[in-house]
């Protein structure tokens, strides 16, 4: 697939990009220090942008793989430079999302109906490139843009595929070809198979067609720096080579294919059937059955273009294949150019003499003349039809043609449509044709359609890629047919739609996969019936599968990354069903010769692809610049998450799925709003839930003061500082000035250091990569156990490691009065992760208790802090906190933008005696100061020179 996207944009990537670029420079210089001296000159000579990070994350759930590629680039040059992102993806995969970051904009790929006139469309051409690094069975995705000087850009690509079982194993291949050495290179593969993982191996890097390949002859075992963790149903594989390790593999950054191969535990009988939320998948792969006899004709191109290594390697491969034929098989050999050279006029049994004579015949075939593909196929089909018609075959057998060519039809019938129709008419659905295209000049589309229409498979073999070995490998996939005429039935009153259920053959080591959509979710079981032929008998298998509609521990829900689908949850089985259905519609469309039928198939495939965000030949991808509007920005920035539509995979080991933020509300619905907060000028509220008491106080600070609100740096690693801004006091007020929080800084040093700097207009998140988010657009981002949810112009919710949560309220004024300032409020929503030693103006009360020890009779039931006051100006009560007696009065105070009202005991004395120490003890030297908030072993006396004014 060649997907070429060119954007010449000259926007700054983020605000303060010069400073960020310098920080990236520092990182890249550290990378250079780790590179061997002989490689430094090579890096200096590069004129293309530096790739700072290349990350691939694959999550495989019951053979269905979600893969996301993330790439970050930096232009260190003094002029604009073009950056190209390219990624080989499996030929069978569907792209589901592509996103680019440049300037302050996020360019998201939107799957739309195919519009040939649109110049912005990214088309699914399904054409292979001529690039040197193109591998068999893969397509190339390319995108390019111009990065301004000293700026950076990022690319994010997501795709999905169903892994096919070949030779008894599933193989997941990831292209690791960043084209340069990368400071941070990571490949991570998670495998979840509820039936159990029986074998798992990581192969050496495979890159046979590239000069820079690090795969040496005799390489065995996984690549260096590969880590494998596995239990019965789950496996995690991580490949994280250093720059030095990359250089030893390939100095040009073309490392090759990272391949994970595995198999699963399977039932001997009906197969593995999984049901989830109205959809099912059926994996059928029987074993330990006697093989069916084969009737096979080898058809070999001996035209002039096959001279040399191609013909020699093909002969050697066929010698190996002939040696592998079983005694019950029948075979023949045809060589063709512009003449059809048939070894014998009938099929021969497999005997030592016949095998020897067949080899001799092959070696006497000499290349000459043109290419009569139609004539060769008709001769082979006639041999097989005659054998079946003339022999009373007791054993059921499978008729196969293995057809090898390196070119296009040049002699006899050359019209491809006529060749296809002639072949289909002659085979009558009874003969399977397996085609092999050798070299780059072959008419691969013709071979592909020949196999597609005649129950076969096709392979492309590059002549410089050990063609003989590839041919033998292809034959190994079909050498052992176990069943024929397979039919799998499900009750029509239960299953609304199922993918293909009729299969001509089943070969040992492969797998039949059927997915279906059920009529109704309210039933207890799914009846499955399999009928097939095996040698001398029919095989009938029946079973009722219990259906439990629940969130199973080994099932994983997948959440689309687009608001267009209304936020509905799509499970992996539903996506597998849609994937197979689209594939089958495309296959039927290619085979159809009726324009009306083709249009109907095209429309069905297009509608399904649009619904599930698949890039197909009937859909296109348009890049839109909507700004940061959706609540799925973690799909763009989250390097460790599977990103893009339909690839945000939830916790692989837990059954529950966390709800997503509802941006229509003014706060994250997962977060319960707490009374413990500081807001306004600044008004502090502290909740003591055990005592059913709420205490409030004011701090009259100075503009520029930085207050320590939460200090738990040595334990949980969290510190929160707030910087004050000044404003004139309102007319006739009792205060000389007001102060508000203009900046809240949250610092985290576990598990890795990161910080958040929040103002009413923006959020700066530095979790390894610096990210600037505007507060006027709703987004959700995640990094290193930190989740930040911005609800536009309303609030920011910060969740740390799942057990600490803060809500920062945004106060904005359209037409502010002189005494008003845009400012922030800070609320502690979840403090479970903070330690008992937590301190700060708010933090010191989180694990404390308070008690009213003396109050006048006028308060009555107000000791429980529930009733309303009888009147204002009530006398003082005494509150006991940490052994200190604090005079307080009862008051009502509004919090959370006036949406809630709390009854609290108010300390009028600027928190004297209530807090440990005095106000100055809570002043930080700068916003990123993490020193202990208070170094006192005993309380100090309150300051006497601070104003003790009450402000409400």
Swiss-Prot record:
Chain residue ranges for the region called Disordered: 113-138, 933-952
Compositionally biased spans, kind Basic and acidic residues: 113-131, 940-952
Domain VIT: 35-161
Subcellular location: Secreted
Protein name: Inter-alpha-trypsin inhibitor heavy chain H5
PANTHER family cross-referenced by the UniProt entry: INTER-ALPHA-TRYPSIN INHIBITOR HEAVY CHAIN FAMILY MEMBER, INTER-ALPHA-TRYPSIN INHIBITOR HEAVY CHAIN H5
Carbohydrate attachment residues: 97, 127, 136, 231, 508, 776, 795, 862
């Amino acid at each position: 697939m060649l997907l070429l996207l060119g954007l010449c944009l000259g926007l700054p990537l983020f605000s303060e990009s010069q400073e960020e670029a310098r920080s990236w420079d520092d990182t890249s210089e550290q990378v250079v220090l780790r590179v061997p001296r002989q490689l430094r000159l090579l890096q200096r000579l590069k004129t293309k942008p530096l790739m700072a990070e290349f990350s691939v994350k694959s999550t495989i759930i019951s053979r269905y793989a979600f893969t996301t590629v993330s790439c970050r680039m930096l232009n260190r040059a003094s002029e604009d430079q073009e950056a190209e992102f390219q990624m080989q993806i499996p030929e069978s995969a569907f792209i589901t999302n592509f996103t680019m970051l440049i300037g302050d904009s996020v360019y998201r790929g939107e799957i739309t109906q195919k519009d040939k006139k649109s110049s912005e469309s990214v088309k699914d051409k399904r054409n292979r490139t001529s690039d040197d690094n193109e591998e068999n069975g893969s397509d190339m995705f390319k995108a390019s843009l111009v990065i301004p000087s000293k700026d950076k850009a990022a690319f994010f690509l997501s795709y999905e595929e169903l892994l096919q079982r070949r030779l008894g194993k599933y193989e997941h291949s990831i292209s690791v070809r960043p084209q340069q050495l990368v400071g941070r290179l990571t490949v991570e593969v998670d495998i979840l198979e509820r039936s159990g993982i029986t074998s798992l191996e990581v192969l050496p890097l495979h890159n046979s067609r590239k000069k820079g390949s690090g795969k040496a002859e005799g390489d065995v075992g996984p690549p260096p720096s590969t880590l494998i963790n596995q239990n019965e149903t789950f496996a995690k594989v991580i490949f994280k080579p250093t720059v030095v390790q990359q250089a030893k593999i390939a100095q040009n950054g073309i490392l090759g294919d990272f391949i994970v191969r595995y198999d699963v535990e399977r039932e001997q009988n009906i197969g593995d059937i999984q049901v989830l939320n109205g959809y099912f998948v059926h994996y059928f792969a029987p074993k330990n059955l006697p093989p069916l006899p084969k009737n096979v004709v080898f058809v070999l191109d001996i035209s002039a273009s096959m001279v040399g290594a191609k013909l020699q390697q093909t002969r050697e491969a066929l010698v190996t294949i002939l040696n592998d034929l079983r005694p019950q098989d029948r075979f023949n050999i045809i060589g063709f150019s512009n003449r059809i050279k048939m070894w014998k006029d009938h099929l021969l049994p497999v005997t030592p003499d016949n095998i020897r004579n067949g080899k001799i015949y092959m070696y006497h075939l000499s290349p000459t003349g043109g290419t009569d593909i139609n004539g060769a196929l008709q001769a082979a089909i006639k041999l097989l039809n005659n054998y079946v018609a003339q022999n009373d075959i007791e054993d059921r057998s499978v008729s196969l043609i293995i057809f090898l060519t390196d070119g296009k039809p040049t002699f006899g019938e050359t019209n491809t449509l006529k060749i296809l129709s002639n072949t289909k008419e002659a085979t009558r659905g009874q003969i399977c044709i397996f085609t092999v295209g050798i070299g780059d000049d072959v008419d691969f589309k013709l071979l592909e359609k020949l196999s597609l229409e005649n129950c076969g498979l096709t392979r492309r073999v590059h002549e410089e890629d050990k063609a003989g070995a590839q041919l033998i490998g292809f034959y190994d996939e079909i050498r052992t047919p176990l069943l024929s005429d397979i039919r799998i039935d499900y009750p029509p009153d239960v299953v609304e739609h199922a993918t293909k259920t009729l299969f001509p053959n089943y070969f040992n080591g492969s797998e039949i996969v059927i997915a279906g959509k059920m009529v109704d979710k309210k039933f207890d079981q799914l009846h499955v019936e399999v009928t097939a032929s095996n040698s001398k008998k029919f095989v009938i298998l029946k079973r009722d599968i219990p259906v439990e509609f629940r969130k199973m521990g080994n099932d994983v829900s997948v959440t689309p990354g687009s608001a267009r689908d209304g936020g509905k949850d799509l499970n992996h089985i539903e996506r597998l069903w849609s994937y197979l259905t689209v594939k089958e519609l495309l296959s039927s469309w290619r085979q159809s010769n009726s324009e009306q039928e083709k249009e109907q198939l095209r429309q069905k495939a297009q509608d399904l692809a649009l619904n599930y965000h698949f890039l197909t030949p009937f859909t296109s991808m348009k890049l839109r610049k909507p700004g940061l509007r959706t609540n799925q920005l973690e799909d763009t920035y989250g390097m460790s998450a599977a990103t893009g539509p339909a690839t945000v995979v939830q916790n692989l080991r837990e059954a529950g799925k966390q709800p997503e933020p509802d941006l229509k509300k003014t706060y994250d619905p997962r977060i319960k709003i707490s009374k413990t907060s500081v807001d306004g000028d600044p008004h502090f509220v502290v909740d003591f839930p055990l005592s059913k008491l709420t205490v409030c106080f004011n701090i009259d600070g100075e503009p520029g003061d930085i207050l320590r609100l939460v200090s738990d740096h040595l334990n949980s690693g969290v510190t929160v500082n707030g910087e004050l801004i000044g404003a004139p006091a309102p007319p006739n007020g009792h205060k000389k000035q007001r102060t508000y929080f203009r900046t809240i800084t949250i610092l985290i040093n576990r598990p890795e250091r990161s910080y958040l700097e929040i103002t009413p207009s923006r959020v700066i998140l530095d979790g390894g990569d610096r990210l600037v988010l505007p507060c006027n657009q709703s987004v959700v981002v995640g990094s290193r156990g930190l989740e930040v949810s911005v609800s536009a112009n309303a609030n920011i919710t910060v969740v740390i490691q799942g057990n600490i949560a803060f809500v920062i309220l945004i106060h904005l004024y359209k037409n502010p009065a002189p005494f008003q300032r845009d400012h922030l409020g800070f609320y502690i929503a979840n403090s479970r992760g903070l330690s008992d030693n937590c301190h700060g103006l708010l933090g010191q009360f989180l694990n404390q208790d308070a008690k009213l020890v003396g109050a006048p009779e006028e308060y009555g039931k107000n000791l429980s802090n529930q009733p309303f006051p009888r009147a204002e100006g009530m006398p003082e009560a005494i509150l006991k906190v940490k052994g200190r007696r604090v005079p307080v009065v009862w008051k009502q105070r509004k919090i959370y933008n006036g949406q809630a009202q709390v009854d609290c005991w108010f300390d009028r004395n600027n928190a004297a005696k209530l807090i440990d120490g005095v106000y100055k003890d809570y002043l930080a030297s700068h916003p990123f100061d993490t020193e202990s908030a208070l170094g006192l072993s005993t309380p100090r006396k309150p300051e006497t020179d601070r104003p003790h004014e009450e402000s409400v």
